[in-house]
């Protein structure tokens, strides 16, 4: 393969594109510096390379710098001389890393990638099956290359016997041969143009889709060859390039042996076989021997290029497969991922971390020894500049001896020189942050406790790495962008990430608690100082309730100021905290018991009102106070803190009695095995909860006597305080310590029915211990698997989104998504206020009275979203990354607010990577388990009615009802909802109403809290008729499609429909209830699903609203719900679920029962005129949810099942699809309590919609039904529009993140992701060009990435390049546009003086200035 870079000047970094294509033999020879003729490597006695061998110095260059092999010419002065004795050019030794050689192959050899990488390019080009091509290649069959006048066909295969027979019959009128020569001749003889014409004709005429698809594939391949300038015969090699020797080294190890790269073995085999073949041909050896040797040469080259791709892999002496050229570049250890995307860095160290409770937020403690090693160069230069040392050598000695002056200089060097701390795994950008180092004794790095959450660090032996930014530019970026004080908010959710945890929370909770009857209760103080004095002198207790006079200024988020004055009721502890509360925040924030949530609120409020700097100071002070008081409190865990409730034994006895009853009922066959199991699980979980509740009662209350009176007060029990404050532990853990452990899960998620009645304080018996090992080990195994899976998900997400950067301010679209509150189980889970915050409006917000409240294009901040809430707005249209019209990037308006910075996102922000990190990072917190509905997990009470939780009005949505003979309104629609709005008209509840529910109130009626608005049978779904008439049962035959059961106890008869799989005969019968009028004309037919129990008999008369049959809901409830990480991966991979719901492809009327086949049922959709518009064939086992004659709209569900996102996009449109992915993904995260902003998920969805399928090619070169990048279609349409031609029509197609990553425009990005061989094979045939637009491609070639400061540099250099062209300036003239400079803003002189070479690149200077302007620094 020929990389376009190679012909450029080696030092040049100034290339804009990289092109990859097939290399012709001439190109390979032009790279080469000589032919490798011998398989020898180096002489075992002299250790010098053999001439013409694999390490030959004449071909590849000298071994030592500027010295020829025989030693005649040495030193720099002979540079460029070719020694006449040994033929070596006097040059630097590093040319041995660059100079290639070549091997002239005696016979052509096929490149295995183009043969075996599927689809086989050679097979496709020649229109031959891969098997046949291989038969010819490996000398099993002849192939006819020119049939002449004989009846043989071109490309026909002949065995040896057939070939001999043909020779006898036709003599030499035809040509047939075998091996790579034959393939090469066929490739070279193909007339590409005429083949293309033939294929185009075939595409248009062909009726069969399979043929058409194959023709399109082949047409595409031929077209690429035609367009790319590659010749097909170049897929067969006649010259083999040889890698430079320093890239496949041979190093002597002790004992006179050599360690060598596997490539040398592989090259040796090729050279040996090539030379042997040359000899055999010179000797005119028999054909069979030559053939065998040619085959062996082909196999040797195959092994060198891609070992193991065909047949068994060639192994070395230790039975290990040899590493071929392909293995060198692919996989985690390959060139791409090991050396280009992940490099090791200098000036770094790592050590264990310990806690640094006295540090400030922007500091870290760095061990002196480590700092000295890291900052050595700076120390050396300072020692010289300060006159302490005259040479570097002397400075080095001083540092080694650790003289006193060295430590002083180290102090000055590290002053204000930030270092980067990183903790692996770096799952999001907060995994690397900058700190100012503080020198400490010891060997461990000290870390500030508040940043632990961001690093996910704890101090149980975690290690962290330190990196030193060297250049001034990098120090500046570290300080402005990466300093821990500039990363207060999480980029995933916009919530503070430096909130106190554990001990700090416990300390703050402890001192803000109040205690009845404490010393000094009821006293009045005039100021904080008075309280402090009284507390320190011991006259008042820290928990005493007191009165305090305050006088403070308070700011709100809108910037208004008001005074907070007067006497407040508080406690001593809260008054002591008043000192750390900054001016501008209300005392009411502190004047309560501070649990974790409340502390988080204080920090949040401080950030909103006072800004970053004040927040950092406050966070530090809160931390110091928390640590101080948690130490003073003396809270710790003792055995007596766990109080076992008195009624525990009684409760357990009661449970055991109930279980005994249930077991007896089961034994006398009154209940099923399933019911027995579920009941037992229910009893134990109820008992366990009750014991837990009484334990909490006991632990959470203390009885004290105040002035002789007994009073119950909240307990000061240590365990209770830890859990209550949110510092450590949970109710569930406390229940296991002092209540009962309860039910344990098996690894598959089901519950073990023998509960553990003991708790940890009493201790477990051997059996109980054994029972609990089950679940515990599952947990550990899960965690290990989960980490790897979450990491892989993150990697796929980053790969798909890496090139998505904000590249412009506004794309000008008015498209967007409709946002409303997210409602689950009737409750508002996420209010609109939260979803809308930080988004840009796509349309005006209008109140009910028609007043424009907010105009389109407004960025919604905290104050504006409150305005929405106050005016009862429950739906708005916001701009979204999914609908952004910017090409190859995003615009700032569609993205909205940068969550970590609280203002509109900057141009140049790499939002794609941030989105991927935000979704991937919590992945490790998600569960791996799939949840089972059933077992104790969700056996709550079965819901059979809906009670209103808020007073207001109800409104029906998509609900159709009929009135039955009792006068009740019965719902007959499927996807109906009842919406409850409050007096302001805001949606407060939303409830899904099942078919068959009774609704007592009409739409628009007022309701009070607790009113019932719907009731239904929770155990069965009824089929209800909306017409009156006589029943005719069709295909309901006892013993075949249905079974009669007679209940002895109740005397009831039931008819139940049986499943098709249970029938031996008559599989095409379809049980149906027909309703006919007096004349026998059909009014309605209702298909009966498997398991349906009939409520009517043949010939019975039905009224409107009567129940025809009931489908028991037992069976449908026990399907597994995929949860956790696998569900997120499933969504982003856009997998089609098994037995997905079938959606209607168009509007029309459903017609069933026509022309059903043996296995399948046919659904026809007909238009008004009775013409069939669409037909769908389904297995008979699928249950339809539509009736014959029902009207459906495009996208309505015809057969139920899980949603297929592809169909949703196709039939319901982009908005419904986006909504579905957002809600589904968010619900998984919400279950784990993880907050992720919607826009991150939208950003990934945008990348999943990068391709579109052509519906009508218009006047373009595209082919119908082909899928192409959306950007290319839009660009083509622009051209066509300008020329006044017909544009391309297309529709979006959905691709999973893996497929989307592999089909990006950049082949470098795709190759470094997965399936490297396939990607490179395809790219080289297409002569693909990589425009180096994404982040990954630029990292690979070692440049600034085009985001942030890199984007500014890129824009600047593009501007300069343009000016150069206009002015005709040559490359060596320095030229910068300084017109936009404003030297007053920043004085760069101070920076210049620190840099020895004064010439700072001006465009970097400009970009840094832009960066500084965009951050309020």
UniProtKB/Swiss-Prot annotation:
Annotated residues for binding of Zn(2+) 2: 811, 884, 891, 894
Gene3D superfamilies: 1.10.132.30, 1.10.150.390, 1.10.1790.20, 1.10.40.90, 2.40.40.20, 2.40.50.100, RNA polymerase II, clamp domain, RNA polymerase Rpb1, domain 3
Any one biological process term the GO annotation gives: DNA-templated transcription
One Pfam family it belongs to: RNA_pol_Rpb1_2
Keywords from the named record: DNA-directed RNA polymerase, Magnesium, Metal-binding, Nucleotidyltransferase, Transcription, Transferase, Zinc
A single Gene Ontology CC term: DNA-directed RNA polymerase complex
Cofactor note: Binds 1 Mg(2+) ion per subunit.
Protein's UniProt keywords contain ATP-binding: no
Binding site for Zn(2+) 1: 68, 70, 83, 86
Major enzyme class: transferase
Sequence positions that bind Mg(2+): 458, 460, 462
Record-linked SUPFAM superfamilies: beta and beta-prime subunits of DNA dependent RNA-polymerase
Domain of life: Bacteria
The protein's required cofactors: Mg(2+); Zn(2+)
Enzyme Commission number: 2.7.7.6
Signal peptide as annotated in the record: none
GO terms, molecular function: DNA binding; DNA-directed RNA polymerase activity; magnesium ion binding; zinc ion binding
Reactions listed under catalytic activity: RNA(n) + a ribonucleoside 5'-triphosphate = RNA(n+1) + diphosphate
Transport listed as a keyword: no
Chain's role: DNA-dependent RNA polymerase catalyzes the transcription of DNA into RNA using the four ribonucleoside triphosphates as substrates.
Record family assignment: Belongs to the RNA polymerase beta' chain family.
Assembly behavior: The RNAP catalytic core consists of 2 alpha, 1 beta, 1 beta' and 1 omega subunit. When a sigma factor is associated with the core the holoenzyme is formed, which can initiate transcription.
Protein name: DNA-directed RNA polymerase subunit beta'
Organism: Francisella tularensis subsp. mediasiatica (strain FSC147)
Gene from which the chain derives: rpoC
């Amino acid at each position: 393969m020929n990389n376009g870079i190679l012909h450029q000047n080696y030092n040049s970094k100034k290339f804009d594109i990289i092109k990859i294509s097939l290399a012709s033999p001439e190109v390979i020879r032009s790279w080469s510096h000589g032919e490798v003729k011998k398989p020898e490597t180096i002489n075992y006695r002299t250790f010098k390379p053999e001439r013409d061998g694999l390490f030959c110095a004449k071909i590849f260059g000298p071994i030592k710098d500027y010295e020829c092999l025989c030693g005649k010419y040495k030193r720099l002065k002979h540079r460029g001389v070719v020694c006449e004795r040994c033929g070596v050019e006097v040059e630097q030794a590093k040319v041995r890393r660059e100079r290639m050689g070549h091997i002239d192959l005696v016979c052509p050899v096929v490149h295995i990638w183009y043969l075996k990488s599927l689809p086989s390019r050679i097979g496709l080009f020649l229109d031959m099956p891969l098997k046949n091509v291989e038969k010819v290649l490996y000398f099993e069959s002849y192939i006819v290359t020119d049939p002449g006048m004989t009846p043989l066909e071109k490309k026909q295969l002949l065995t040896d016997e057939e070939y001999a027979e043909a020779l006898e019959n036709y003599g030499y009128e035809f040509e047939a041969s075998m091996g790579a020569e034959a393939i090469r001749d066929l490739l070279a003889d193909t007339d590409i143009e005429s083949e293309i014409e033939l294929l185009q004709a075939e595409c248009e005429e062909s009726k069969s889709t399979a043929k058409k698809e194959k023709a399109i594939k082949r047409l595409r391949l031929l077209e690429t060859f035609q367009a790319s300038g590659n010749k097909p015969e170049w897929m067969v090699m006649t010259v083999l390039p040889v890698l430079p020797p320093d890239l496949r080294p041979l190093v002597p190890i002790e004992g006179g042996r050599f360690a060598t790269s596997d490539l040398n073995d592989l090259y040796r085999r090729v050279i040996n076989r090539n030379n042997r073949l040359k000899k055999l041909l010179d000797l005119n050896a028999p054909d069979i021997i030559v053939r065998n040797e040619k085959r062996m040469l082909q196999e040797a080259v195959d092994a060198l290029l891609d070992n193991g791709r065909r047949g068994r892999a060639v192994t070395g002496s230790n039975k290990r497969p040899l590493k071929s050229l392909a293995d060198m570049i692919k996989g985690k250890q390959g060139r791409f991922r090991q050396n280009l995307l992940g490099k090791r860095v200098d000036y770094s160290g790592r050590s264990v971390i310990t806690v640094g409770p006295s540090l400030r937020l922007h500091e870290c403690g760095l061990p002196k020894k480590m700092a000295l090693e890291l900052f050595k160069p700076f120390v050396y230069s300072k020692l010289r500049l300060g006159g302490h040392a005259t040479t570097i050598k002397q400075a080095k000695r001083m540092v080694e001896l650790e003289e006193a002056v060295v430590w002083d200089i180290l102090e000055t060097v590290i002053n204000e020189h930030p270092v980067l701390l990183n903790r692996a795994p770096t799952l999001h950008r907060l995994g690397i942050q900058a700190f100012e180092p503080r020198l400490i004794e010891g060997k461990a790095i000290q870390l500030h406790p508040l940043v632990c959450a961001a690093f996910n660090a704890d101090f149980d032996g975690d290690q962290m790495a330190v990196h030193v930014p060297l250049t001034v530019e990098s120090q500046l970026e570290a300080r402005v962008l990466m300093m821990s004080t500039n990363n207060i908010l999480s980029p995933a959710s916009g919530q503070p990430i430096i909130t106190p945890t554990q001990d700090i929370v416990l300390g703050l909770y402890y001192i803000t608690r109040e205690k009845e009857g404490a010393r000094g209760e009821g006293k009045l103080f005039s100021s904080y100082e008075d309280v402090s004095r009284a507390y320190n002198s011991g006259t008042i207790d820290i928990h005493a309730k007191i009165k305090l006079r305050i006088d403070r200024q308070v700011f709100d988020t809108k910037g208004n100021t008001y005074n907070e004055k007067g006497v407040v009721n508080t406690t001593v502890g809260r008054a002591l905290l008043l000192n750390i509360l900054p001016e501008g925040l209300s005392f009411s924030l502190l004047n309560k018991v501070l649990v974790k949530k409340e502390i988080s609120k204080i920090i949040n409020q401080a950030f909103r009102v006072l800004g970053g700097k004040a927040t950092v100071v406050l966070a530090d002070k809160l931390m110091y106070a928390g640590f101080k008081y948690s130490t003073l409190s003396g809270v710790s865990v003792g055995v007596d803190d766990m109080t076992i409730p008195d009624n525990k034994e009684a409760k357990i006895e009661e449970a055991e009695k109930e279980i005994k009853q249930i077991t007896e009922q089961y034994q006398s066959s009154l209940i099923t095995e399933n019911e027995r199991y579920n009941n037992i699980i229910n009893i134990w979980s109820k008992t366990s909860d009750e014991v837990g509740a009484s334990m909490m009662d006991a632990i959470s209350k203390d009885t004290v006597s105040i002035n002789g009176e007994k009073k119950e007060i909240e307990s000061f029990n240590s365990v209770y305080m830890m859990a209550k404050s949110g510092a450590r532990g949970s109710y569930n853990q406390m229940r296991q310590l002092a209540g009962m452990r309860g039910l344990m899960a098996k690894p598959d998620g089901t519950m073990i029915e023998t509960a553990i009645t003991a708790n940890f304080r009493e201790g477990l018996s051997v059996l109980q211990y054994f029972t609990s090992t089950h679940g515990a080990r599952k947990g550990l195994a899960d965690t290990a698997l989960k980490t790897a899976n979450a990491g892989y998900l993150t990697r796929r997400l980053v790969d798909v989104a890496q090139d998505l950067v904000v590249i412009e301010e506004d794309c000008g679209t008015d498209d967007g998504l409709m946002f409303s509150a997210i409602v689950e189980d009737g409750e508002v889970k996420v209010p609109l206020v939260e979803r809308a915050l930080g988004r840009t409006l796509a349309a005006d917000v209008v109140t009910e009275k028609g007043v424009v409240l907010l105009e389109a294009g407004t960025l919604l901040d905290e104050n504006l979203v409150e305005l929405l809430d106050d005016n009862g707005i429950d739906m708005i249209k916001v701009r979204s990354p999914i609908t952004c019209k910017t090409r190859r990037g995003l615009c700032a308006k569609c993205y909205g607010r940068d969550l970590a910075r609280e203002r509109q996102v900057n141009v140049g922000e790499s939002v794609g990577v941030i989105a991927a990190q935000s979704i991937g990072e919590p992945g490790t917190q998600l569960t791996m388990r799939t949840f089972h509905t059933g077992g104790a997990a969700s056996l709550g009470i079965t819901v059979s009615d809906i009670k209103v939780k808020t007073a207001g009005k109800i409104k029906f949505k998509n609900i159709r009802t009929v009135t039955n003979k009792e006068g009740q309104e019965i719902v007959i629609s499927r996807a109906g909802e009842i919406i409850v709005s409050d007096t302001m008209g805001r949606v407060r509840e939303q409830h899904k109403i099942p078919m068959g529910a009774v609704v007592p109130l009409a739409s628009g009626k007022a309701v009070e809290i607790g009113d019932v608005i719907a009731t239904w049978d929770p155990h069965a779904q009824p089929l209800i008729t909306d017409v009156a008439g006589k029943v005719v049962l069709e295909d309901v035959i006892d013993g075949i499609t249905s079974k009669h059961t007679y209940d002895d106890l109740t005397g009831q008869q039931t008819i139940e429909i049986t499943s098709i799989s249970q029938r031996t005969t008559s599989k095409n019968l379809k049980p149906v209830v027909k309703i006919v009028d007096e004349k026998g004309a059909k009014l309605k037919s209702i298909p009966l699903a498997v398991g349906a129990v009939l409520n009517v008999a043949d010939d019975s008369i039905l009224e409107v609203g009567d129940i025809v049959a009931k489908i028991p809901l037992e069976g449908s409830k026990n399907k597994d719900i995929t949860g956790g990480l696998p569900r997120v991966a499933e969504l982003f991979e856009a997998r089609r679920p098994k037995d997905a719901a079938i959606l209607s492809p168009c509007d029309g009327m459903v017609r069933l029962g026509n022309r059903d086949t043996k296995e399948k049922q046919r659904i026809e959709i007909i238009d008004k005129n009775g013409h069939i518009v669409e037909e769908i064939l389904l297995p008979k086992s699928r249950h339809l949810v539509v009736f014959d004659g029902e009207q459906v709209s495009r996208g309505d569900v015809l057969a139920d099942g899980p949603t297929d996102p592809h169909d949703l996009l196709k039939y319901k449109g982009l908005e419904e699809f986006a909504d579905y992915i957002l809600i589904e993904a968010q619900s998984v995260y919400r279950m784990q309590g993880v907050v992720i902003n919607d826009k991150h998920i939208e950003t990934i969805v945008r990348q999943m919609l990068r391709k579109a399928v052509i519906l009508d090619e218009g006047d373009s070169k595209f082919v119908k039904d082909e899928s192409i990048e959306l950007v290319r279609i839009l660009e083509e349409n622009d051209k066509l529009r300008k020329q006044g031609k017909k544009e391309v029509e297309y529709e979006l197609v959905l691709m999973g993140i893996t497929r989307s990553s592999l089909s990006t425009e950049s082949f470098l990005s795709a190759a470094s992701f997965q399936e490297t061989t396939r990607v490179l094979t395809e790219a080289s045939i297409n002569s693909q060009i990589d425009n180096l637009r994404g982040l990954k491609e630029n990292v690979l070639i070692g440049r600034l990435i085009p985001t942030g400061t890199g984007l500014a540099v890129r824009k600047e250099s593009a501007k300069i390049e343009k000016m150069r062209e206009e002015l005709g300036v040559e490359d060596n003239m320095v030229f910068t546009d300084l017109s936009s400079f404003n030297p007053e803003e920043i004085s760069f002189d101070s920076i210049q003086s620190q840099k020895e070479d004064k010439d700072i690149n001006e465009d970097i200077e400009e970009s840094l200035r832009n960066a500084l302007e965009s951050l309020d620094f």
